[in-house]
Amino acid sequence: DVERSRGLGDVYKRQLQERLQPVGRQYDLPMVSILDAVTPQFSGKEQKRVITKNQFFYDMFHPTNLGHTIMADCLEYLMEVCDTSDHARVDSFRQGMTEEEVLEQCLRGEPAIGNSFEKVKLLDRRDGYEGASMREGGFDATDHELQCVEMDQDLCTTPEFPYNWMYDGTKPDRAFFELTITCRALFLIFKDSGEVDAGTADVLVDGEFRFTADPHVNNWLHCNAVLVFQEKETAAHTVRIQMSGENLDKKFTILGFGYVE
């Protein structure tokens, strides 16, 4: 329930509780609010605090071991409450339906926060799409310095988006990547970085400037998905990603694209 924020000052500014709670309520899912559990006492007097914001959050893994312990304790308490409570919903008695039938009815209803990207698919060097063609330009290298995550029960980390396109700063005469794709929504996934040799890239759709992708906004090794366009109908578009004017000798990595047909 807590999104891992980028710094101590915004521990809960990017917290997703407000946006995701409606989903839990609609489908009657058990929820634990770390926000409600720990933040009220952050602003209390020192002698009344159980834990400070620094103690809960601030280390490279954010939250700290202590913070993770509190989160685990909250989830464990939730399981204890579930084990000792009556599992039958009030709705199931009132409507004469089983819990499974109630849930199935909920799933047939309108989504709580939309489903525009329910069927998004990955496009990268390995996973192609017949409705897409591309010119790599100077983005012909592969980046191996990637964000890594633990997958399933594997204790070793796995690099994310290994089938990428990287501009390595050595081809200023073709410092662009061009994608022609037929879809109704498109995400660009690019690599955030804190390295000084990382540069920015301008994103254009059908010749019109949309935004500049800047790896230094987040400033750490991270996968960043940004919406390039979203339309009601499927149509063909040409997306051009080109290094910004003074960044021709810098690096930029396109990790992949997400598209909705």
Residues covered by each model-derived region:
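Single conserved hydrophobic/aromatic residue that forms the stacking wall/gate
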Residues: 1-12
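Conserved catalytic region of serine esterases and O-acyltransferases that act on ester linkages
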Residues: 55, 60-65, 69-261
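Extracellular serine-dependent O-acyl
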Residues: 14-54, 69-83
